[in-house]
Amino acid sequence: MKLAFVFRSTPFGRASTREGLDALLAATAFCDEQDIAVFFLDDGVFSLLNHQDPAQILQKDVVNMFKLLDLYDIEQRYICLESLATAKMTASDCIITCEKMARAALLTLLGKAERVLTF
């Protein structure tokens, strides 16, 4: 994998998640899909929590935009099991499917990326 996008912060309250998703989708224009991986850990798992209503806090719906990963054929998607447990979430709570990995294994895989962008 050449390019890793790491989502570590909550999707609302700041623009980093939206900016990260924009960068990820833009990267698909110049990288092969198999060269891009997406990682969700810490509060970044909330970026995938289904049934959120950001209109209640006057925010744009960034969460549903993650469904575009399927359209763009981004298949290397990983989520931290420990972060899911801390957030009291399960994989069925997520808006898209991701490979669930222990934190240590996820960080080992992340270490193989040529470039890492964190949001």
Swiss-Prot record:
Cytoplasm in keyword set: yes
UniProt-annotated location(s): Cytoplasm
Gene Ontology CC annotation, any one: cytoplasm
Entry annotated with the keyword Cytoplasm: yes
SUPFAM superfamilies: DsrEFH-like (SSF75169)
Pfam families: DsrE (PF02635)
Keywords linked to the UniProt accession: Cytoplasm
Source domain of life: Bacteria
Main localisation: cytoplasm
Protein task: Could be part of a sulfur-relay system.
Family, similarity comment: Belongs to the DsrF/TusC family.
Protein name according to UniProt: Protein TusC homolog
